[in-house]
Amino acid sequence: MTKPIVFSGAQPSGELTIGNYMGALRQWVNMQDDYHCIYCIVDQHAITVRQDAQKLRKATLDTLALYLACGIDPEKSTIFVQSHVPEHAQLGWALNCYTYFGELSRMTQFKDKSARYAENINAGLFDYPVLMAADILLYQTNLVPVGEDQKQHLELSRDIAQRFNALYGDIFKVPEPFIPKSGARVMSLLEPTKKMSKSDDNRNNVIGLLEDPKSVVKKIKRAVTDSDEPPVVRYDVQNKAGVSNLLDILSAVTGQSIPELEKQFEGKMYGHLKGEVADAVSGMLTELQERYHRFRNDEAFLQQVMKDGAEKASAHASRTLKAVYEAIGFVAKP
């Protein structure tokens, strides 16, 4: 029986955070045995915001080494760089012609990013969701792990696939969202009502996977809790967002349940909780960074992973693009 196909990716812009790891990368690792996993470093999406060329090249290799350090296995999964598989951009252009301006105008992420990068509101930023649809549909993807911020884009991918299929027959699989049974939603350390984001300008809000564990300890000890007297370590996202975030992080790192942790910290000060979180996270990062540096220092291996991954991805992508071009009426290349 063929395994269902899963597609996901991350941009090589900004350092990946513990939020990316606990909410996404760790789920990707766990899916490798039960699904045919295709994991992409989406460098073409990254250039919708201005990038320094040298930094982008470095960030791409850094991200690949992090994928591997987190446990993504090139023997089990297809791992590749988006720009190495030209079918992504080719299908993206074709799908533009089956996507309506009004649909893209309603994308909330475009509104957010165009407000943030007002000096560079480019067509690529507006068109980003169509390239994302191409990324997904190229591989006849069954399932896409998505967070809240990408649900709208996946819905558009489904709409485009259904519209194209209505015109030309069943060319595309219509992808479904994959909602993992467990996966921590890690919030900002100083503003715990918003998600931790690798693009946050205030770096005290964020814990990067490659940060010095000593600086991580300091950040966690400065994390927002609340002013309850006496302090109560209780999971209550509405009324105790900072404490709940620390409990979520500790639970994700140690595997202990929230009720177990509440019992463990009953009658204790917030400083005790922060100390435990700091020790657990810094220990996890120390081990992960050791694996990361081993991969990052072996550039020949990284080049081989990218080459093999692009070849595997292209074999699949070219079949879909050929079917699309035939359906549209393009003359086949002699």
Swiss-Prot record:
State the span of motif ('HIGH' region).
12-20
Gene Ontology CC terms: cytosol
User: Which BP terms does GO give this entry?
Assistant: tryptophanyl-tRNA aminoacylation
What does the entry list as the binding residues for ATP? Answer: Q11, P12, S13, G19, N20, G147, E148, D149, V186, K195, M196, S197, K198, S199
The UniProt record lists the keyword Translocase: no
Instruction: Give the protein's biological function.
Output: Catalyzes the attachment of tryptophan to tRNA(Trp).
The name of this protein is: Tryptophan--tRNA ligase
Q: Which organism is it from?
A: Escherichia coli O6:H1 (strain CFT073 / ATCC 700928 / UPEC)
Taxon lineage: Bacteria, Pseudomonadati, Pseudomonadota, Gammaproteobacteria, Enterobacterales
Q: Which gene encodes it?
A: trpS
